[in-house]
């Protein structure tokens, strides 16, 4: 019993010391004979000063890991990417509501899942080039959040496109046309194998 009580204290569980534990510590008799009736003074629990000190130490350990901005707000910063604000209450358990903001894109978000979704949507797919083996590569470029309302221009043939989706579709088509073009007949292929097969067919036709 004494061992269980000391384990609870070491974990930080604050309870008052039961009378049985007090008697065990002082070496008194644990069982009371029936003819003896305990008085009201014996029912009072023993309060240990050491218990209050341990409780204060446990609270101090948890509070050292965070910075206090004022008496009602608590902010944690992890690598400067995401700032979390917690509201403090009289209850020792922190509130689970988190307001996150993403410094990299400058957007305030309600929760972490929106942060993940916004990071994915802030990258745009831009067809860039075909590599040596004929695989189509997509390079990720950061979208400018301030240029969303402006018409976008594609330098490949000088057409101005107002919507991002139209621009991506246009760039995709232009890149496929430029990817593997066989100059003799003017046909374009998006895979090197198809282009080389067509070259062989064309060369046999000319013989």
Swiss-Prot record:
ZnF start-end (C2H2-type): 177-202
Domain KRAB, residue spans: 1-43
SMART domains: KRAB, ZnF_C2H2
Keyword Zinc-finger annotated: yes
Keywords of this entry: DNA-binding, Metal-binding, Nucleus, Repeat, Transcription, Transcription regulation, Zinc, Zinc-finger
KW Zinc-finger (keyword) present: yes
The organism's place on the tree of life at top rank: Eukaryota
A Gene Ontology term for the protein's cellular component: nucleus
Disulphide bonds in the chain: none
One GO-annotated biological process of the protein: regulation of transcription by RNA polymerase II
Signal sequence bounds: none
Compartments reported by the entry: Nucleus
Transmembrane segments: none
Molecular-function annotations in GO: DNA-binding transcription factor activity, RNA polymerase II-specific; RNA polymerase II transcription regulatory region sequence-specific DNA binding; zinc ion binding
Family listed: Belongs to the krueppel C2H2-type zinc-finger protein family.
Task performed by this protein: May be involved in transcriptional regulation.
Protein name per the record: Zinc finger protein 487
Gene from which the chain derives: ZNF487
